[in-house]
Structures are given as structure tokens and as C-alpha cells.
């Protein structure tokens, strides 16, 4: 379009009639009357402005532009605990440019930089705080308005009182004038004439006075009536004003109280917003009273000390006060003197009233009234029952302090109960409560004063969305039923061949990606010794796969696995393994499981039964489908973007890596560098490995990982959680360790009391002390339980120490001191430990299969048993002739009728088949030669030791006592 256009062209361009456009141009102030007139750009702008103004679409030109610039820095500042923290500081700069008329853009104003500190995490959300502050401000405004109204009422009431006081003064003045007039009239009435002349002269005056007096009396009576009415009205008004004043005062007090509460609430909200993070504070028992004595009353903490009752004479402010007697002053000196420790000297201690050998000069006795106590009589106090809060463990001294008695009294009562204790010995809760009840007080179980109450704060602050998670499946069953082989087929790996003896002795944790989703598997041992390990597996699981061999059926550990699964309340999927064998019988297995209350779905139960073969892989896909179907029914969810929580499945001490724990994450995400609290140990996660040994940085729910960096080896089965503060984690771990130690010591002491009488016969019992070192926590626990079960009434297994890790020099030293056998399960001794063990004759035994350890220890214990004595008859002889020899006695000539006769054997003398003597031989001869034995059908001569009453025809029965080794 050209710079100039005709009206007709512009109308055609706008699709408007030319007449309409000319009319609009005329209205806009552009003088165009013909279609051929030319239009410039200025004319078009005028037309546009007119049309926009007429239609209300005028856009005001922007006159001002504001620019905001932000910059963020960090500063370090100490918080309430004294720890340096990094605070984010945000600086906002605002600058505004205004377009002037002359066309220049100049900055109109520059706002000062606004420093905004990193916001504190509020306890209450911002909307709630704003609402509360607005409500508090409205409340305060209402109170101010009501106070203004009250002040106005008070001002009006004061003006009314002032007017009433003025009227009262006027009434009093009128009453006084009326009274004065009445007194004058009375005086005039009483006046009498002195003389008759005076009387005559005074008569007209008297009549006039009487008239005046009558008028005055009438006026006075009217004034009195009026005053009485006014007094009644005034009293009523005053009573009404008083009532209104009291009501207003009560209302003002109520308003003031409400205003104070509103201001306190607003101040509390502001303090809450600016309050520092909560820290641990030592617990103070609210029931602990501040105790004092009669002469020295207790002073509350923080209270000022009471001022002196009276000052010294001449002291400021002493004037006008009662004088203090000298004897009262000297009493304080006596107290100070009594507090001072006496100087030790030779001789007896001076007794008050009896003099001392170090008496005054010239043998005079000194006055010892000052040394005499005020009174030796102590008033008996009434017994007071105290509520004693007894924690889990408490020392004897602490218990005595809580009951306000001496420690010796508590020790006496414990001695009466048959327990010898010292003042610093810890008592368990049950024993302490018995002692408290025995001493007549009331024992209450104390609430735990532990820092663990703050562990939930971090978790509650993390409100993350719960997302679906993978199921955790535990494979359980009897030993050698094919649990690990089934998992091998699922994982396409060969793990069973790597286990010692082909049996599983650790919990294996794996996660498997299947086409239908991820599943985490826990493989538990089936051997009977690993009961606790199986229970931990059931505790951490969502679904249990119960593996039963089709050719073996339900066995003891199968029943135990069913009990664990039912106790944990998890669904059971039964996998009947080894169906490819010729002697497999699935119907028999189903019948046995029905007996154990595991009902298959085809019989109307809840447990799906799947036949599988770990060798060929038959039925494995169906088994996984059933597992995932059960997981869908359970709707398993867990928060992902939160602090990790889970369970310690296994723990061990690695020589190169230190304490290593296998954990199963149940919720949240575990990251490298997180501070972890697990039971009584803590640490920062230095490294994380998956089940294949590959390092990973993060792990989410249902993922088993191996973590390093803990300070000690945790207990298998402990819960672990991620803490935000390492200092708090250390505090809780230290507290738990001390609590565990105190509880353990107290239980040991309680067991000593129970075993007091059984220890009398303990000398007859032989002890086999052992020290166990295993590779992982679960194996150590299982081996210790299995070996302790071998104890009998004659030989007991004494577990000196059990731990995780290799055999060190300190273990050998402990074995030397306790004369114990060192057992290494999947561990070995280092060079120094081996050398020290050889030098001191310490027996170190290594095992990698739990059967071998149990069998060898059982054999060693069998060797310690006292052998049984068994009598064995070796031969008989008949006395054919008796010879009497002087100085020797009777010699029997015998014929050996059966067996053999030995010189060292014992014999019985039978006469008419009745034993009349049991003894031994003095000599045995054949012809003239001494012999050791004589065989059957040979003759011999023998002399019985210390016995001569023998006859022909007697039978001699020879026997030996043999020791037979016993077995457990």
C-alpha cells in the first residue's frame, strides 16, 4: 500500500461503503467529502484513534518497565546446637524505568536489595499461619474497639458522678440553712417576757414571731421531704451506677484477658516460625521434688536467695527493726563450727558433759556447753510411701536414692532374697520392682527415656507418594528339596554347586527381571539348625514359595516353614519339585500338606499348587505367574522419594572391607553417602554392591544390596533406617548398645540367683568350652544353637565367645585363658594366631559344613563321658580237693570246667549256687610254676586272698570288669 491512498481505495480495502467511511472520517476530524480525496498516514491514525475511543479498546501506552534481578549466595552460620550450617541467601534487586515525555528512558527508582534468607521449614504451613495472624489481628482490633467504647462509658460515668456530687453539695448547703433557721425560731419561742410592760409591748412581736416560725416549720418539712425523695433517687442511681461499673470492670478484665491471649498466640506463632531445630534435652523427672530441711529450706533453681532476717546494728535499713539477741547470733557460729572437721588428736574424743583430759589450766574443767549438741532426740517420722519409677536396668545406689534410703538397706533386703550384690551392680527391672514392693513402696514401670523418640521425626517429615513395588519372595522348604536349584533355573545361574556340601548355609538375596516384572528372591537354608534365619526370611517377605519334593513329601523343616509363613501372615505358593522323577507322587504330597492346613485352590483353599522341575524347567513359568498374581492381589506399594528403611538380612566381617551387611530395602531409596542406623551400630554408606558384586549408587524398594561403612557388625534381623543427622545416629546407637549391655548384665545376675542351688552339684558336671568364629552372622548363630543343644546332664557345652570374622590373636588368647576349643566355620586363622596356638597347644578346628562340626563335637563330648562298667564272666573252675598249708592257709586244687582262669581276674565263690564270697586270687600255680592263666580242662592250684573257708565241690566263677565307652 502506497503512502497516500484515495478514500474509495481505502473503503474497498476495508470492505466498507464509501459513504460510511467518509462519515467516519468527518466524525474523526478529517475533512474528506469525495471518494477521490487522498488519505495520508496521519489521517488513517486519526481515524484509528477515533474508532478505538468510540469502541472502548484504547490501549494505554506503557510508561514504566520494572526489572528484577536475583543473585544467590551461601553463608555459614552456627545453629542452636553450635554446629555450622550453610544457609542460602537470595538477593533481589528491582529497578524501574519510566518513559518521559521527551522520549528519554530514565530510572525512576531503584529499590534497595532485598535479602531473603533461606526459609525455615515451618511446623505449620504458610496458609494456616497467615490465617491465624489475620484472625489474631482482627481479634486485637475488636478488643481495641471495645476498649475505646469502655473508656467512653467510663468518661460519661465520671461526668455523671461529678454532677451528682455538685447536687449533693447544694442539698447539704440548703439543709444547713434550714437547720439554722429552725434553731433561730426555737430560740425565739423559748424567750419569755421579764416584766408585764415588756410582755404587753412584746405581744404583737410574739404573734408575729410565731407566724414566722410556723412558716419556717412548713418550709423545713417540705425541704426535708424533698431531701428524702432526692436521697432515695440518689441511692437508686448510685446503686445502678455501681452495678454498671462492676459489670464494665468485669467486661474490661475479660477483654483484657482475651487480648492478652490473642497477643500471646500471635507471639507464639511468630516464635514458632523463627524457632531453631529441636535438639535433644536431658529428661527431667517432673515428679522429682526439691527437697530441703527445717533450718535450710529448699530454693528453687533460678530463684534468688532469701535476704537476711535482720541486719547488723548500724547497717543501712536496720533502723526500726527488732534487735537480734546474741544467743541467736552465736547459733550460726555453732553451725559453722560444727561443719568444720575436727583436728585429729591422741586420746578419746571429748564427750559433752564429761570433761576432757586436756582440760583448762590448774585442772579446772572448761565449760563444754558450746560443744554439747542442741538436742540428741530425733522425732520419729511417719512412713511415707513413694512411687518409684523403675527403668529396665537400675543400679543399687540409684534405686536406694529413689526410695530415699541408704544403699545398705537395699543390699540387706537383696541378701534376704538370696542375692549378693554390690552398690554399683545393675539390677533388672523385675528384681528392682520386687525390692521396692518388699520395702513398702509402690513400684511403677518407668517410661523409656531414650533418644529414639526423635527417630520418627525424620520419617514423618518425608511424606512421599507410595508407588507400586516388586514383591519380595522367600523360598523355604526342607533340606535337599531343591530350593536353590529352582532359583538357579530362574536366575539361569549355578549357585548350588558353589555351596559347601551342596546345602545352603546363608540367606541368598537376588532380584530377577522377568518379562512380567521384577521379583526379589530370598533363598533360606533348609537345615534344622537355621531356624532363626528362616524366621528372618519370613519376616521380610511378601510371598512364600514352599518347595516340597514330590518323592520325599512333607518333612520336619517343611512343617516349620509353614509355621513361620503363617506366623508372618504371608500367602503361600506351593512348588512341588522333582516331578520329573519316576517315584514322584503329587497326590501324596497334597494330602500331607492338607494335613498341615495348607489347602490347594482345587480343594477350595487359598494356596496355589504348581508342579515344577528345577532340572528341566517344567512349570517354572506357571510358578512365576502365580507369584505375580498374588503380588497384584496384595497391591504392594512403598514410597520411593523418601529416606530408606529396611531389614538387615545377613552381616559379616570382611578382612579387607570391614563390617559388611546385606540389607533388603523395604521403602525409600538408599544412596551412597547416607547415614545408616542399624540396631546398635551406625555408619555412612561408603559403597553399595548388588547381588552380582557390581557397585551401584542408589537402590529402591524391594532391592537387596550389600553395604559397607558401618562401625560394627550389626545383628542379623535388625531394622535399619537412614538418618539425616550423623550425631543423632551415633547417640541412638550408643544408647542402644549401653542398654543392651545393662540388660544382659542384669539377666546374668538374675540367672546366678536361680542357679545358686544347682551350682552345688556342678562339680560333677564336665564342661567343654568352645569359641566359634564364623563367616556370617546367621551361620554363627545357627552353629552356636546346634552345639549348645548337645549339652547333657554330665557334659555341658560352654559357649565362651562367638563372633564373625577370621580367627585372630585375641581369640587364641581367650582360648588359652578359658582352655577352649577354637572352631572356625568358613574362616581361617592368620599367621600370628596359628603360631600362638601351636606354641600353647590350642586346638583349632576348621569346618565348612555344619553337619561335620556337630558330629565331631558330639564325638569329643562322648569321649568326656564317664564310661559304663560292664562285667564279663571269663571262666569257671570246680574245687576237687582242699589242702591245708601252715602260714598260707587253704589251697584249692581245681579243674577249669569252662573258659579261662586268669591271675588278675576277680572271682565269686558259689556253694549250692549261692554266692558266699567275692574277692581275688593271691596266687595261681600249675604244678610248681606260677602262671598267669589256665585254660579249660586243665588242673591248677590257687589260693584265695584273705579267705580260707572253702570246701570240695564249691564252684569258682571268674569275671573281669570292662569299661564300655558311652555315646551321646
Curated annotation (Swiss-Prot):
Its main location: cytoplasm. Residues 523-526 are annotated as: G3. Residues 613-615 are annotated as: G5. The keyword Protein biosynthesis applies. The keyword Disulfide bond does not apply. Keywords: Cytoplasm, GTP-binding, Initiation factor, Nucleotide-binding, Protein biosynthesis. Gene3D superfamilies: P-loop containing nucleotide triphosphate hydrolases, Putative DNA-binding domain, N-terminal subdomain of bacterial translation initiation factor IF2, Translation factors, Translation initiation factor IF- 2, domain 3. Residues 305-376 are annotated as: Disordered. Residues 468-635 form the tr-type G domain. It holds the Pfam family IF2_assoc. Residues 477-484 are annotated as: G1. One of its GO terms (cellular component) is cytosol. GTP binds at residues 477-484, 523-527, 577-580. Residues 577-580 are annotated as: G4. Residues 305-319 have a biased composition (Low complexity). Belongs to the TRAFAC class translation factor GTPase superfamily. Classic translation factor GTPase family. IF-2 subfamily. One of the essential components for the initiation of protein synthesis. Protects formylmethionyl-tRNA from spontaneous hydrolysis and promotes its binding to the 30S ribosomal subunits. Also involved in the hydrolysis of GTP during the formation of the 70S ribosomal complex. This is Translation initiation factor IF-2. The lineage of its organism: Bacteria, Pseudomonadati, Pseudomonadota, Betaproteobacteria, Burkholderiales. The gene is infB.
